[in-house]
């Protein structure tokens, strides 16, 4: 094995027609990833563990290499966005993560402090047995906008009604008169607590 080649992805963008295909494949992979997230089945008097549905991680939790996270990263235009990223490394002495933008077109690597990284749920909550492990109707959250790799602020319109169901969320969107999008479906995997980002 050539040193440094492990886990590297192809960065050849000469095949332009393949970009749409790659993007379609990425969206399919993200959807698949959400569907295969294990469902937590609680026993009597058992509480859902951290990172089950809306249950936050422990304060000292460190995401593992390969985990998907939401990361507040600065883009090429100097704007900051919460992006879907993969953890490459965590430096315990500096308390910083190295993460890779999951979007191949951006393919940016970022070094970020812990407060700029939010781990995604590792388990789905079962609405039947653990409704308290879900964000309630009206909760302010961050959710992955459908067909993108960015998280945006949204209000929960309806929590999942069954283990296989998605949230229905209303994204903040000034192009609509009410300031919110129509209800859009987002999987539990990609709905997290809202981190306040300072307005410019």
Residue ranges and their predicted role:
Residues 1-200:
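Eukaryotic chromatin- and chromosome-associated nuclear factors
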